[in-house]
Amino acid sequence: WPAYPGPNGIRSSVCQTKLGCGKKNLATKGVCKAFCLGRKRFWQKCGKNGSSGKGSKICNAVLAHAVEKAGKGLIKVTDMAVAAIIKYAGKK
């Protein structure tokens, strides 16, 4: 189970800063914001040890790792997608 980022670490604004949302291109901002909000909800629900008492289905180590990894991959993928869209749009 990855380390709980802490009450400050799960904040959407902190997450966005860490991921550098919208720095390279503004299109990543929306995707990034949505991801950071989802991540915040995940950690709020799952807490430090990964369960909200009821053993929620979404609170598992695999998902927690995926959530933390996704942030890093997400921006890269969005940047690539935006670049591809711009390239494609320019061809018409």
From Swiss-Prot:
Transmembrane segments: none annotated. GO terms for molecular function: toxin activity. Signal peptide: none annotated. Keywords: Cytolysis, Disulfide bond, Hemolysis, Secreted, Toxin. It is found in: Secreted. One of its GO terms (biological process) is killing of cells of another organism. GO terms for cellular component: extracellular region. Disulfide bonds join 15-36, 21-32, 46-59. Localized within the skin and proboscis and are most readily isolated from body mucus secretions. Its main location: secreted. Cytolysin that shows hemolytic activity (on bovine erythrocytes, HC(50)=5.75 mg/ml). This hemolytic activity is completely inhibited by small unilamelar vesicles composed of PC/PG, PC/PI and PC/PS in 1:1 molar ratios (with at least 100 mg/ml concentration). Belongs to the worm cytolysin family. This is Parbolysin P7. It comes from Parborlasia corrugatus (Antarctic nemertean worm).
